[in-house]
Amino acid sequence: MNPRRKTRLWVALTVLAGLGLTMALVLYALRANIDLFYTPGEILYGKGAAQEKPEPGQRLRVGGMVMPGSVKRDSRSLKVSFRLYDARGVVDVDYDGILPDLFREGQGVVAQGVLGDDQRIHAREVLAKHDENYTPPEVKAAMDANHTRPPQAYKDNRP
């Protein structure tokens, strides 16, 4: 192999290795920033055919209805705890911050945060349903499939 071809080969291999490393780092960074959507029942019993449950410490978004009578506010701080339910389960959510104006019992909300060891969601952000005309497709599908009875019909069925 002549020196010119050898140099081209090394340059090509170096460029390919650099691109591979760049892609690996980008994919790793994106993986760390993904928040998967779950319903309360999927958190408790698993999601999909494989019944995959989220791991404690995993970042996630959970969508459901705020259970009537479950909102507890701390009088000395902005801490709030409430329960989200769907047809398959109930999960507790803790939040420290100002709730949206449209947050109320019986309304649909999405809480974004981290799943704790105690199966509680420690939310960083709470989003309240703001418009009846638009709901993200995955939230609408989950709500239609899981909310067929009145709130009083759901029990605390945590494992």
Swiss-Prot record:
Classification via InterPro entries: CcmE, CcmE-like_sf, NA-bd_OB-fold
Major site of localization recorded for this protein: membrane
Regions of this protein lying in the Cytoplasmic compartment: 1-8
Pfam family, one: CcmE
GO biological process: cytochrome complex assembly
Annotated positions binding heme: 130, 134
This protein's record includes keyword Heme: yes
Keyword field contains Kinase: no
Gene Ontology terms, MF aspect: heme binding; metal ion binding
Location of region: Disordered: 130-159
Location(s), subcellular: Cell inner membrane
Residue stretches spanning the membrane: 9-29
Keywords: Cell inner membrane, Cell membrane, Cytochrome c-type biogenesis, Heme, Iron, Membrane, Metal-binding, Signal-anchor, Transmembrane, Transmembrane helix
Regions of this protein lying in the Periplasmic compartment: 30-159
GO cellular component: plasma membrane
Family: Belongs to the CcmE/CycJ family.
Protein name: Cytochrome c-type biogenesis protein CcmE
Organism: Cronobacter sakazakii (strain ATCC BAA-894) (Enterobacter sakazakii)
